[in-house]
Curated annotation (Swiss-Prot):
Residues 5-230 form the tr-type G domain. GTP binds at residues 14-21, 91-95, 153-156. Residues 70-74 are annotated as: G2. The keyword Secreted does not apply. Residues 194-196 are annotated as: G5. Belongs to the TRAFAC class translation factor GTPase superfamily. Classic translation factor GTPase family. EF-Tu/EF-1A subfamily. This is Elongation factor 1-alpha. This protein promotes the GTP-dependent binding of aminoacyl-tRNA to the A-site of ribosomes during protein biosynthesis. The gene is REFA1.
Length: 447
């Protein structure tokens, strides 16, 4: 069997008609876990509906529709394999909650695949002031997705077809734009492809013989292997807490950093409750250690279900335990707020698994979101497209961390009026020590 391949997560971004679904569908179709029978069914339906426009996008549309109807689709459908990696497409925009998902995301993307429409007019629409290409790229960079592959798509529909001049023009323009966002364009492969015809997706295309770089598949294989943060102190945000007869209280969540082991003494922030972990399970099997990315349930001694809540964070009592945040300062980008945001604004913050109202206590500075340079001290307000440093105070106890130390606990979405109005990363946190926190007997013995 040999060593298992490393898993990586990919997020596909780009303007609405750039061909994201066709390209992603094509990869999944050719390299993925979709059953041939399912594909044949899709093809037949597509033909009946005269959607010659294609089985690939159709595959993805079907998957999306089923996902939105709440039918859990076998997640294998969103996976495909390269020579080196197992790739999972964690979300494709166009999905209503894309921005929120990308931030509170069940997983951090290791690489963004930016799809550009190379056709006349199509490219210009995508990169224009209000095109989504800019917003998505900025979002990916702000949230720490440092690797990118850029696909110049629809090369079969440029004038003339497969035009090198058009490709060069796009590379130049997109490079200068990505540089402003913060990426280094010299490190980004620009692959000319046709997601529809299949040129340069998996095999080299003779239509593009002027291009000497990698195919999309080769570019995916060249992604730098992600480092998983198992050497950091433990952080495990709780998703749920169950009471299981004969076993007791079982909190459930995903290890974001560090390691969780049976016998460990854990402290739950923000309350400071401290207890011993009896056992750790994943998919109903006992684990000797849980690592970042593992979704686990663990049994804790002498703790009532009511003492723990979704949004609490389990940590190692002896290694930088999680604490309540009295306040924190974040770099925030306002994305779609219709008005002006000033001191006293009180939206809801979605950060890891917690969902808590916070107050914008103080707008500290307004900054240039590309260079990070300060534009104005103590601005009166921030509006759409602005970035700023903001001091926030939670209205209820919550745990957050700086983005640099614990990335998944240091990025958030600001929600208001049922949409994401801003995104942010946390620069520093003022923590407060718990008062009168309960320490169970088992934990006290181990001290």
């Amino acid at each position: 069997m040999g060593k298992e391949k490393t898993h990586i997560n990919i997020v596909v971004i780009g303007h609405v008609d750039s061909g994201k679904s066709t390209t992603t569908g094509h990869l999944i179709y050719k390299l993925g876990g979709i059953d041939k029978r399912v594909i044949e069914r899709f093809e037949k339906e597509a033909a009946e509906m005269n959607k010659r426009s294609f089985k690939y996008a159709w595959v993805l549309d079907k998957l999306k529709a089923e996902r939105e109807r709440g039918i859990t689709i076998d997640i294998a459908l969103w996976k495909f394999e390269t020579t080196k990696y197992y790739c999972t497409v964690i979300d494709a925009p166009g999905h209503r909650d894309f921005i929120k998902n990308m931030i509170t995301g069940t997983s951090q993307a290791d690489c963004a695949v930016l799809i550009i429409d190379s056709t006349t007019g199509g490219f210009e629409a995508g990169i224009s002031k209000d095109g989504q290409t800019r917003e998505h790229a900025l979002l990916a960079f702000t949230l720490g997705v440092k690797q990118m592959i850029c696909c110049c798509n629809k090369m079969d529909a440029t004038t003339p077809k497969y035009s090198k001049a058009r490709y060069d023009e796009i590379v130049k323009e997109v490079s200068s734009y990505l540089k402003k966002v913060g990426y280094n364009p010299d490190k980004i492969p620009f692959v000319p492809i046709s997601g529809f015809e299949g040129d340069n997706m998996i095999e080299r295309s003779t239509n593009l013989d002027w291009y000497k770089g990698p195919t999309l598949l080769e570019a995916l294989d060249q992604i730098n292997e992600p480092k998983r943060p198992s050497d950091k102190p433990l952080r495990l945000p709780l998703q749920d807490v169950y009471k299981i007869g004969g076993i007791g209280t079982v909190p459930v969540g995903r290890v974001e950093t560090g390691v969780l082991k049976p016998g460990m003494v854990v402290t739950f922030g923000p309350s400071g409750l401290t207890t011993e972990v009896k056992s750790v399970e994943m998919h109903h099997e006992a684990l000797q250690e849980a690592l970042p990315g593992d979704n686990v349930g663990f049994n804790v001694k002498n703790v009532a279900v009511k003492d723990l809540k979704r949004g609490y964070v389990a940590s190692n009592s002896k290694d930088d335990p999680a604490k309540e945040a009295a306040s924190f300062t974040s770099q925030v980008i306002i994305m779609n707020h219709p008005g002006q945001i000033g001191n006293g604004y009180a939206p809801v913050l979605d950060c890891h698994t917690s969902h808590i109202a916070v107050k914008f206590a103080e707008l500290v500075t307004k900054i240039d979101r590309r260079s990070g340079k300060e534009l104005e001290k103590e601005p009166k307000f921030l509006k759409n497209g602005d970035a700023g440093m903001v001091k926030m105070i939670p209205t209820k106890p919550m745990v957050v961390e700086t983005f640099s130390e614990y990335p998944p606990l240091g990025r958030f979405a600001v929600r208001d009026m049922r949409q994401t109005v801003a995104v942010g990363v946390i620069k520093n946190v003022e923590k407060k020590d718990p008062t009168g926190a309960k320490v169970t007997k088992a934990a006290a013995k181990k001290k």
